[in-house]
């Protein structure tokens, strides 16, 4: 078994919907919901929701790159979001719900940029990809009740995943491509 561990940080709108797809993959050691990219130290959910902290809801993933490489994380990430929407994701609007790939080193940046370019050229989306690739910033874990929300509140999570429009978007854009 490999001893390697790396971090990947992705903002993809509501973090509730970003945990499950990664959590279920081999080589994923930990998926944590939280906040990143802003100026407020140790923000609360309520503060982030005001769109005044500069933070985005995000997930930070600890993974073994020998089992689940960063390139595969990127592929899975793109399939969870609308990368053409710079105003938020699905039913959630505002700065805190914008997408972003937070890179932890130069190799991640190179892979993220190549992945974004490939997606832009794929023709899957009619509009340009606006997801930003940013340097990793301090990551602040969200409150405990947000962690692994899909396990703690299955019915509400499923209702939200569908009701927000995310599930339908994923189905219409990726069902025959993954």
From Swiss-Prot:
Active site residues according to the UniProt entry: 14
Known function: Has an important function as a repair enzyme for proteins that have been inactivated by oxidation. Catalyzes the reversible oxidation-reduction of methionine sulfoxide in proteins to methionine.
SUPFAM superfamilies (alphabetical): Peptide methionine sulfoxide reductase
Domain of life: Bacteria
EC number: 1.8.4.11
Tagged with keyword Oxidoreductase: yes
Primary gene name: msrA
Organism: Bacillus pumilus (strain SAFR-032)
Identification of the protein by name: Peptide methionine sulfoxide reductase MsrA
């Amino acid at each position: 078994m490999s001893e390697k561990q790396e971090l990947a940080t992705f903002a993809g709108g509501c973090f509730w919907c970003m945990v499950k797809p990664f959590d279920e993959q081999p080589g994923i050691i930990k998926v944590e919901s939280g906040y990143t990219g802003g100026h407020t130290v140790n923000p609360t959910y309520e503060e982030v929701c005001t769109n005044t902290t500069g933070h985005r809801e995000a997930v930070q993933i600890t993974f073994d790159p020998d089992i689940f490489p960063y390139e595969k994380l990127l592929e899975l990430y793109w399939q969870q979001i609308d990368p053409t929407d710079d105003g938020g994701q699905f039913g959630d609007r505002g700065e805190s719900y914008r997408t972003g790939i937070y890179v932890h080193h130069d190799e991640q940046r190179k892979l993220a940029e190549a992945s974004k370019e490939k997606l832009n050229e794929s023709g899957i989306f009619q509009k340009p990809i606006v997801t930003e690739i940013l340097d990793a910033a301090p990551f602040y874990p969200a409150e405990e009740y947000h962690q692994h929300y899909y396990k703690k509140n299955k019915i509400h999570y499923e209702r939200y995943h569908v009701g927000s429009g995310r599930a339908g978007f994923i189905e219409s854009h990726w069902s025959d491509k993954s």
